[in-house]
């Protein structure tokens, strides 16, 4: 494929947003799109295909690749707990296999997020200096995730900052 093959093409642009829930009809199939306010970005979506029992969770539930905490960690943990009650046979995560069983497929992400939160709370209570706290927080998750060494220190630092500001 060369430049001539894509000349005149355009990337589709969203023409509407989702607040609450919205149903999209795709011929004989309907997808239910639900806004998740407290997820990894603060403006995430869950898509349900009731016909196949599939939830598309995207970055709400990364798999194998370390979650990137850039919004409300407590809200993300709570959102995953609420979502665990959603009826589904499988989920399609971000950065992983095509499908995972539900709700068990969310366990590693929930474990990591909870570990970061609880460890950060402990280090704050101890008065641990930030550089040392960043090394201790979530240390038990090292080796379980792709890009741990690259992403995790930032997750720990952002979590410490957010908890100290509360």
Regions picked out by a protein language model, each given a short descriptive name:
Residues 1-36, 41-42, 50-51, 80, ...:
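Metallo-beta-lactamase
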Residues 18, 47, 59, 76, ...:
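Divalent metal-coordination and catalytic microenvironments
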Residues 43, 62, 98:
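Short active-site segment of divalent metal-dependent hydrolases/proteases
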Residues 77-128:
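Divalent-metal (often Zn2+) His-rich catalytic cores of metallo-beta-lactamase-fold enzymes
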Residues 62-68:
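Surface-exposed cleft-lining segments at the edges of enzyme active sites
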Residues 38, 53, 59-60, 95-97:
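Active-site metal-binding loops of divalent metal-dependent hydrolases
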Residues 125-166:
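C-terminal regulatory/interaction regions
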Residues 63, 73-80:
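Pocket-lining segment of extracytoplasmic ligand-binding domains
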């Amino acid at each position: 494929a060369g430049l001539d093959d894509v000349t005149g093409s355009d990337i589709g642009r969203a023409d509407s947003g989702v607040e609450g829930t919205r149903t999209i009809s795709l011929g004989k199939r309907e997808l239910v799109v639900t806004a998740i306010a407290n997820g990894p970005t603060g403006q995430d979506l869950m898509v349900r295909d009731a016909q196949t029992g599939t939830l598309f969770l995207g970055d709400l539930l990364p798999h194998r690749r370390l979650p990137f905490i850039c919004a409300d960690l407590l809200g993300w943990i709570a959102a995953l707990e609420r979502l665990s009650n959603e009826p589904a046979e499988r989920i399609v995560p971000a950065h992983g296999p095509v499908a995972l069983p539900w709700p068990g497929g969310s366990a590693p992400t929930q474990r990591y997020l909870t570990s970061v939160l609880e460890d950060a709370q402990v280090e704050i209570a101890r008065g641990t200096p930030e550089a040392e706290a960043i090394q201790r927080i979530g240390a038990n998750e090292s080796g379980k995730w792709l890009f741990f060494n690259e992403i995790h220190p930032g997750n720990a630092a952002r979590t410490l900052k957010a908890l100290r500001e509360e």
